[in-house]
A protein has these predicted regions:
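Alpha-helical transmembrane segments in multi-pass membrane proteins
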Residues: 27, 282-290, 313, 317, ...
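Membrane-water interface of transmembrane alpha-helices in multipass transporters/channels
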Residues: 299-313, 376-387, 447-448
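Interfacial loop-to-transmembrane junctions
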Residues: 407-426
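Juxtamembrane boundary at the C-terminal end of a transmembrane helix
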Residues: 435-448
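Non-transmembrane, extramembrane segments of multi-pass ion/lipid transporters
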Residues: 115, 242-276, 326-350, 405-411, ...
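Soluble-to-membrane junctions at the N-terminal ends of transmembrane alpha-helices
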Residues: 268-285, 343-362, 386
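Core alpha-helical transmembrane segments of integral membrane proteins
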Residues: 270-340
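Hydrophobic packing positions in regular secondary-structure scaffolds
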Residues: 1-262
Length: 448
């Protein structure tokens, strides 16, 4: 277990050995080891490392772990570490931290770093402004290639962590175009940048949403994209890697929300009360939704007591219809995230899902009807449960495909609310169909 060796080195107060051991570890082993350390050991670890090495370590671990450690650290030490982080990482961590602690850290950061991060934390995390970095190469169009080379050589240490693939050319801060490093290498030192610049540059606004950025990386295979404000001023660059990382995080959050866990990422190292509260948010709502569905059974309890066999098939009809509906929900959520459908296309999606629901409903209805007939030898019972499952599947699939679009149209989170709403509808409708058909059969035939 890698964390045991790490604890030994921390307790022995051996910073060089700690650094060497961390460098020898895989990223996943580092993440696991940090999660196994006690809080005091985590703090001591970051104290033993240099600010630069500590920043590199924090970049590897989940944001929750990083902010949890930094909030317990002296603000001066935390500020020294923040100075070594990329600007987007600074903003991400500070927005997750306690406001008082975050303010104290910003006040002790280097003036340039503090000014940069203050601008970034004003943006929503899932916008271009919130994802962009401010470490990029930018030069005025009137400068020469020689000026650029001189600046890069003079401040080599400053630019060592910058990506030197692209150089952005500006005029009074406004983006004019872009150059690749090879353009500089092939040009004369006396050449002005406005002569060799590529002016047909693609950019995004600082208010661009994550979904718009995802569409961008799907359309263009760029290292990154420059971010502008309404006046065309170059503010930063959103890296392709950061967009893909944000996309992955969004998918993880949506997966948790479909299971009724709200409030973002959950890790078992988080406080028990926080984890409990996030899970209870929808569990408590589900109590009332399930009571609503169960009320249908209560209304038909005389029918159910007369035909005990129905009690066996009710959960099957409910579960199978729910599974079919959730498949449609998953497809709609996926297509919404990819921009393949729009919230106003409810009728189109309903028609497409209705045909699938009809076909699958017939197949599932025949199968469950055959099971009922083989078990009880009753044709009426097989028609009741088969017909109920067929119709409920059609309803579940048709509605399941449209619920995410309707929720998105009204500004609600489709990943969070689609599942509980669909479950309630399929349960109520499935119970209603089965028990209503059974009541009619009893009235007409007297027995089943």
């Amino acid at each position: 277990r890698p964390w045991e060796k790490l604890v030994e080195l921390i307790e022995a107060d051996q910073p060089e050995q700690v650094k060497e051991y961390l460098q020898s570890m895989k990223t996943e082993d580092i993440v696991l080891s940090i999660s196994r350390l006690e809080k005091k050991e985590q703090l001591l670890l970051l104290t033993l490392l240099s600010p630069e090495d500590a920043a590199e370590l924090l970049d590897d671990i989940p944001e929750y772990h990083a902010t949890d450690i930094l909030e317990e650290m002296e603000s001066s030490r935390a500020a020294a570490i923040f100075n070594e982080l990329d600007s987007d990482e600074q903003a991400d961590l500070l927005t997750e931290m306690n406001e008082k602690e975050a303010t104290a850290i910003i006040e002790q950061m280097e003036p340039g770093e503090a000014e940069s991060v203050r601008r970034l934390i004003k943006y929503e995390a899932d916008t271009a402004g919130g994802l962009m970095i401010t470490e990029f190469l930018s030069f005025d169009k009137e400068q020469t290639v020689g000026d650029v080379v001189h600046e890069l050589r003079k401040n080599a240490e400053k630019y060592e962590d910058y990506n030197l693939q692209y150089i952005y050319v500006t005029a009074h801060g406004r983006l004019e175009g872009v150059l690749q490093m090879r353009d500089l290498l092939m040009a004369s030192l006396q050449a002005r940048l406005d002569v060799i610049v590529h002016s047909d540059v693609i950019s995004v606004m600082d208010s661009a949403t994550l979904h718009e950025l995802i569409n961008f990386v799907n359309d263009y295979d760029f290292y990154g994209v420059p971010v502008l404000n309404d006046d065309g001023v170059l503010l930063g660059v959103v890296l392709r890697s950061d967009i893909l990382e944000a996309k992955s995080e969004l998918a993880s959050i949506e997966l948790l929300e479909t299971q009724g866990i709200v409030g973002g990422e959950e890790l078992r190292t988080m406080p028990v009360l926080l984890r409990s509260r996030r899970r209870l948010s929808w569990l408590t709502v589900n109590i009332f939704l399930n009571v609503l569905a169960a009320s249908v059974i209560a209304f038909h309890q005389d029918t159910l007591s007369s035909i005990i066999a129905l009690a066996v098939f009710l959960p099957i009809i409910s579960d199978m219809s729910g599974c079919s509906g959730n498949q449609a929900v998953a497809v709609s959520l996926r297509e919404l995230s990819l921009g393949l459908i729009r919230p106003f296309e409810v009728a189109r999606v309903w028609l497409q899902e209705f045909s699938v629901g009809l076909l699958n409903g017939i197949v599932l209805g025949v199968l469950i009807g055959a099971v009922a007939y083989l078990w009880k030898g009753s044709l009426v019972l097989s028609l009741i449960v088969g017909g109920a499952l067929m119709l409920n599947t059609i309803v579940a699939v048709s509605i399941g495909g449209t619920i995410p679009l309707i929720l998105r149209r009204f500004g609600a989170d489709p990943a969070l609310a689609s599942g509980p709403i669909l479950t309630t509808i399929t349960d109520m409708f499935g119970f209603f169909l089965t028990l209503t058909f059974a009541s009619l059969a009893l009235t007409h035939f007297g027995t089943i």
